[in-house]
From Swiss-Prot:
HAMAP family: Idi (MF_00202). Its EC number is 5.3.3.2. Its cofactor is Mg(2+); Mn(2+). Mg(2+) binds at C65, E85. It catalyses: isopentenyl diphosphate = dimethylallyl diphosphate. Pathway: Isoprenoid biosynthesis; dimethylallyl diphosphate biosynthesis; dimethylallyl diphosphate from isopentenyl diphosphate: step 1/1. PANTHER family: ISOPENTENYL-DIPHOSPHATE DELTA-ISOMERASE. The keyword Manganese applies. GO terms for biological process: dimethylallyl diphosphate biosynthetic process; isoprenoid biosynthetic process. SUPFAM superfamilies: Nudix. The gene is idi. This is Isopentenyl-diphosphate Delta-isomerase. Residues 28-162 form the Nudix hydrolase domain.
Length: 182
């Protein structure tokens, strides 16, 4: 059974609960993460959530999201989910927005209530999306993504809409840092 870490409003752990039980009409705050993957050309990977996903099925979002297991570091969880959702190896995993949190309710009434640090990572392998997680994947520029979010925010996950303006200038910095490390 997959477990998630419950957190207080500061993001500090206060317990655990099964993932299956945590998401509902009144979801307790729990730890999650979002990750944006960039390629060697500086493009961002956006994905459309699989239609069978329990929350926000079919919406476009960042590259992937997930929940760290109890005792798992966020960086290890990011690597694990990149492989699981996208069949992708990543490096240069950087926490760009450590204190991002949001609460949102999808059309089915399920509430998300997440302390959700936002990461940027670099793709180092080819993409093989898991169809149970990802309906579509597309590489795009950050400016094209920002324009699309501004034009049709309803087509994107609420967490992406909420954090992307803060994240956008950090993407270019991450690309330069990754290149400098090589």
């Amino acid at each position: 059974m997959e477990m998630v870490v419950l957190v207080d409003h500061a993001g500090d752990p206060i317990g655990v609960q099964s993932k299956a039980d945590v998401h509902g009409q009144s979801t307790p705050r729990h730890l999650a993460f979002s990750c944006h993957v960039v390629d060697e050309q500086g493009r961002l990977l956006v994905t459309r959530r699989a239609l069978k996903k329990r929350t926000w099925p079919g919406v476009w979002t960042n590259s992937f999201c997930g929940h760290p297991a109890p005792g798992e570091t966020l960086e290890d969880a990011v690597s694990r989910r990149a492989e699981f959702e996208l069949g992708l190896s990543i490096d240069h995993i950087t926490c760009a927005i450590p204190n991002f949190s949001y609460v949102a309710r999808d059309a089915s009434g399920i509430e998300e209530n997440e302390h959700c640090p936002v990461f940027i990572a670099r793709a180092v392998s080819s993409l093989t999306p898991n169809p149970a997680e990802v309906a579509e994947a597309q590489w795009t520029s950050s400016s094209e993504l920002k324009s699309a979010i501004d034009a049709a925010p309803w087509a994107f996950s609420p967490w992406l809409v909420e954090h992307f303006t803060e994240l956008q200038p950090l993407i270019a910095e991450h690309i330069v840092e990754a290149e400098d490390d090589d």
